[in-house]
Amino acid sequence: YESPGMQKYMKDLRPTVFADLIAMNALYRPGPIEYIPSFVRRKNGEEPIAYDLDAMEEYLSETYGITVYQEQVMLLSQKLAGFSKGDADALRKAMGKKQKAVLDKMKPKFVEQASEKGHDPKILEKIWTDWEAFASYAFNKSHSTCYAWIAYQTAYLKAHYPAEYMA
């Protein structure tokens, strides 16, 4: 939270809840960082919160319609395409380890099964592309929460007890 880039984004964001800190921690990484301007605008009411599919709102409302965490990919793959918990975890692992061959096998399954549930294949292709763009650097929420909590505590100490903090 101390880099100039993160400080700029945090000022723009004007966080009001701890969940904002958690999300920013997860987003400030290669790949997901491109979603920060939209995340900030949506949080501040400067851009409408939109979902590629209405069915995604359940899992993306807390992050203003943007997929931020690995868990969201897992839950959405289950909801949209009927992936089993095992398939969803395999998807998470493949994205996290950048296993392109595994992802290339899973994509048609995702698109086909989600299409069978009535979702537009073109929108599904966009969703998958978005997931691929962010997922190789995505945090799980618990990881992001721990780092955000440490940053929050550090900022508090720095602001209220600067001499003790620096000692």
Locations of regions flagged by a protein language model:
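Noncatalytic, beta-rich nucleic-acid-contacting surfaces in large DNA/RNA-processing enzymes
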Residues: 1-167
